[in-house]
Amino acid sequence: MKIWIDILTPKQLLFSEQIIEKLGKKYDILCTSRDYNEVSKLAKIRNFDLIFIGKHGGGDEKSKLKASIDRMEKMSEKIKTFSPDVVISFCSPEAARISFGLGIKHIAFCDSPHANAVMRLTLPLIEKLLIPHVISKKEFSKYGIDEKNIIQYKAIDAIITIKRRINRNAKLPFKKNNKKNILIRVEEEQASYTSKPSKIIPIIKKVVSEFEKENVVVLGRYVEQIKNLQKIVGNKTKIVKMSYDGKHLLENTDVFVGSGGTMTAESALMGIPTISYNAVPNIIENFLVKKHLVKRETDPNKISMQIKRIFEADDKQSQKRAKIIRSQMEDPIQKLIKIIKE
């Protein structure tokens, strides 16, 4: 059997790694992506074999459309030649359209019903959709997929991505001293579901001024974004691009301040004290807050106070809670294997 996996984000790459680990010996797997800085860098770090076709459309709607059409055109020939029996994606619009056009079974994972444009473009064309149990099927069925084709798994996606092996000898951006490491992740700016102005600038300024004696590292996403941050914050803190493995960074972090996305979920399940400034409100972040694995705070002063409390407490509560939650989760890839065999 031949399987095609289309990978568009770093999280999808890490998730796919575990799929390949379980299916790679048995099946012929082709992995594609688009030219997108964070994915290509992570693929290098992880030594992950990817074929890059097309590019990321950026933040503008017209350029997104052009990039998607261009990618579909280039990729459809490649896929026709490869002739897969099954397509796996994370709701890739190009994979949805190509698999529909070529009559190939398409199985997708998704935990982002808030990504309205992507849901509308993909869900009506997908055969089976796998979702975390904490999200209601109705959140997806409203976009045109029948509820009977939605399969829930008792886990969130971070349970898969934190399983990855990492190189613990790799270089890190933190200084080697006895100070606390504070890692701040800047929010996504170019996704179709992002429209609000940045929340992170006042948070960075406050944390940098309050904790100047600690190791504060800001993790950016795009070159332009990093340049803008450097102009605003200056040389008061280290601003880096994502040329590190997130798990390795988190293992060496005392407090993580995230936007509520993938790294926030990974940090929480790893038992790292985690604060979310909730850049894009979503159901997974909500679940983690309810389970007391994440503190949600948007006010820079209150975030600063939370960090102080975490440093003063210095207990293992986060790790204990995370261990309990992890033990209650199942492996979503086993559900995928079952569907492939059907």
Which residue ranges define each predicted feature?
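Conserved nucleotide-sugar phosphate-binding/catalytic loop shared by glycosyltransferases and other
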Residues: 26-67
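Catalytic donor nucleotide-activated moiety binding site of glycosyltransferases and closely related
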Residues: 45-59, 205-240
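A conserved, positively charged/aromatic
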Residues: 107-108, 119-131, 250
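A nucleotide-sugar donor-handling region in carbohydrate enzymes
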Residues: 130-197
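Catalytic binding pocket for nucleotide-activated donors in carbohydrate/polymer assembly enzymes
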Residues: 269-309
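Conserved donor-nucleotide binding/catalytic region of nucleotide-linked donor-dependent transferases
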Residues: 307-323, 342
